[in-house]
């Protein structure tokens, strides 16, 4: 997959040069292209924003630099143009899975008080992280892109790594433990030391169900319980 990122602050995405995504780039599994919107402005002072018509606080990103940067990206990337903004649908794991199946994507990061309305006709999709305010689109783009890339085959190394993670099927992940066995009076559950893989699997499933029911009822209502799930929950409630 190739992802083109349109931004005023390309240095913010240096985080992708490290860890899992860094290795995926080295192995040519994914390609990240950074395009600085400021490089495409026609203003001699490299200005990319201006005062809003009708008055109001702050500055608005002008259409010309953004649209020209989108056109430049599309010269070698025919993917959907995704804008990180408050009007969009709230991003979730299903959206990440759907987008991970695309061959290419283009992400547009806004800044200041927003973008000129005339840019929207060049945008295919708008997504939001939630009902709160961030300094810029870059801060929203990083987790969105990361969540998409880790679903691409070969990025994590083995499929089980993301199948078992939180939200992969509307469930929170089960509790994890490592050494030491005892820490400040708390012990690792004995079942995890039993070596009985089927019992461990059932225990983990029950923990995921129980945690989701208690902490994320909004997710739990979407869970389709299997016969085994109902049996496990029934035993716990006795």
Swiss-Prot record:
Residues bound to S-adenosyl-L-methionine: 110, 129-134
Family under the similarity heading: Belongs to the RNA methyltransferase TrmD family.
EC number of the protein: 2.1.1.228
GO MF annotations, alphabetized: tRNA (guanine(37)-N1)-methyltransferase activity
Enzyme class name: transferase
InterPro entries named in the record: Alpha/beta_knot_MTases (IPR029028), tRNA_m1G_MeTrfase_C_sf (IPR023148), tRNA_m1G_MeTrfase_TrmD (IPR002649), tRNA_m1G_MTases_N (IPR029026), tRNA_MeTrfase_TRMD/TRM10 (IPR016009)
The organism's place on the tree of life at top rank: Bacteria
Subcellular location, record wording: Cytoplasm
A GO cellular component annotation in the UniProt record: cytosol
Gene responsible for this protein: trmD
Name of the protein described by the UniProt record: tRNA (guanine-N(1)-)-methyltransferase
């Amino acid at each position: 997959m190739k992802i083109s990122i349109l931004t005023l602050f390309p240095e913010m995405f240096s985080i992708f040069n490290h860890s899992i995504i860094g290795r995926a780039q080295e192995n040519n599994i994914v390609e990240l292209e950074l395009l600085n919107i400021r490089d495409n402005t026609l203003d001699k002072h490299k200005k990319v924003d201006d005062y809003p018509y009708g008055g109001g606080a702050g500055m608005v990103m002008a259409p010309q630099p953004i649209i020209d940067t989108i056109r430049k990206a599309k010269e070698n990337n025919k993917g959907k143009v995704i804008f990180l903004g408050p009007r969009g649908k709230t991003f979730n794991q299903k959206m990440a899975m759907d987008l991970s199946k695309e061959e290419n994507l283009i992400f547009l990061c806004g800044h200041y008080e927003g973008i000129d309305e005339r840019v929207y006709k060049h945008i295919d999709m708008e997504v939001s992280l939630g009902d709160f305010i961030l300094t810029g689109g870059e801060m929203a783009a990083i987790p969105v892109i990361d969540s998409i890339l880790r679903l691409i085959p070969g990025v994590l190394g083995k499929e089980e790594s993301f199948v078992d993670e939180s939200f992969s099927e509307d469930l929170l992940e089960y509790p994890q433990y490592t050494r030491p066995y005892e820490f400040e009076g708390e012990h690792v559950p004995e079942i995890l030391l039993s070596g009985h893989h089927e019992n461990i699997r059932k225990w983990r499933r029950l923990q995921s169900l129980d945690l989701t029911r208690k902490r994320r009822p909004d997710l739990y209502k979407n869970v389709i319980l299997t016969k085994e799930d109902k049996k496990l929950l029934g035993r716990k409630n006795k």
